[in-house]
A protein has these predicted regions:
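Compositionally biased, intrinsically disordered low-complexity segments enriched
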Residues: 30-67
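Bacterial N-terminal signal peptides that target proteins for export
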Residues: 1-9
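General helical secondary-structure elements
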Residues: 2-3, 18, 37
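Extracytoplasmic cell-surface/polysaccharide-interacting catalytic and binding patches
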Residues: 21-35, 65-152, 159-160, 164-264, ...
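Polybasic, lysine/arginine-rich low-complexity segments
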Residues: 2, 22, 46-49
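Conserved metal-phosphate-binding beta-hairpin within the catalytic cores
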Residues: 269
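Bacterial N-terminal signal peptides
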Residues: 10-19
């Protein structure tokens, strides 16, 4: 009898334990771990030494120019816009007579490889800049010239790439052709390489004259994108009268129709009343 009572007592104890467990509150779920705050990439100060890159080919994949480029500056500029606004146009749609030789789509440039962001050899400009350039075309056609464009809108990703390339003092494969008289370590100080470019705002372009009679590019007394004094507009040492005159014809025609030049590059012009003076775009050229 006592044995039966012990078994009944044991069974009752087990039942009470089960009932108690069912009524216990489920533990509160753990608080999700907070995400760390996003911080903008830091831009090196003017006094800091640039980092040396051992292999510039790691910056981008030349066979796939749309591949993203790792850059300490990418996304760190105020006002960078990645989508193309409706006021940008293909230059060929507005000025079909213009010859386009987009150098940064090719390997014939001061870097020696296709530049990230240049996925097609075409030129984009803001509508305002393109319309003004059409007036320049009509003006010069009466003088027997066409325009030849080397670069127009330039994605910020390309500018970032130039900055990284400029910091790699070991890569000097194109020095003989584009900066033979300038140490690469001086390119930043002399203003040939910068963290920002007017091209990225969409109303700046690089161009030259094309002679309609000879069907040749006009001799300007210096090659496009040459990083040296011969590219300065007022450089005259060793230049012929025709070369100086050609520079003048291009500059005066551009200025008549609302473009402003710069002193250090005879080929570089920006629309005076550009629509995006404070924005730097980075959409790729497609």
């Amino acid at each position: 009898m006592k044995s039966v009572q012990r078994h009944i007592l044991f069974a009752a104890t087990i039942a009470l334990c089960l009932i108690s467990c069912r009524h216990q509150a489920a533990p509160e779920p753990a608080e999700p771990q907070a995400l760390s705050e996003y911080s903008e990439p830091s831009v090196p100060s003017k006094n800091s030494e640039p980092s040396t890159l051992s292999n510039p080919s790691n910056l981008s994949n030349p066979s796939n120019p749309s591949a993203p480029t790792s850059s300490p500056y990418a996304g760190g500029l105020e006002g960078v816009l990645a989508s193309i606004p409706s006021s940008f146009v293909l230059l060929a749609d507005v000025c079909p007579d213009i010859i386009q030789e987009i150098r940064y789509y090719t390997t014939y440039n001061f870097v020696g490889e296709r530049i990230p962001g240049y996925e097609r050899p075409v030129a984009y400009l803001t509508r305002q800049a393109a319309d003004s350039l059409k007036l320049v075309c009509d003006d010069l056609k009466e003088q027997g010239y066409r325009l030849k464009v080397f670069d127009a809108y330039r994605p910020q990703m390309a500018v970032d790439f130039f900055v990284r390339w400029g910091s790699d003092l070991e890569d000097q494969r194109m020095k003989e052709y584009f900066y033979p008289d300038c140490p690469k370590s001086e390119l930043f100080r002399r203003g040939y390489i910068a963290h920002k470019s007017g091209h990225t705002r969409g109303s700046t372009l690089d161009l030259t004259l094309f002679d309609m009679k000879t069907e040749r590019e006009v001799d300007m007394g210096g090659t496009y994108d040459f990083l040296g004094e011969t590219s300065h507009y007022n450089y005259s040492h060793g230049l012929t009268r025709d070369q100086i005159n050609h520079r003048r014809i291009l500059r005066e025609a551009m200025m008549r129709h609302g473009f402003k030049p710069i002193a250090v590059e005879w080929w570089h012009f920006t629309l005076r009343n550009e629509p995006y003076p404070d924005h730097y775009f980075t959409f790729p050229i497609r």
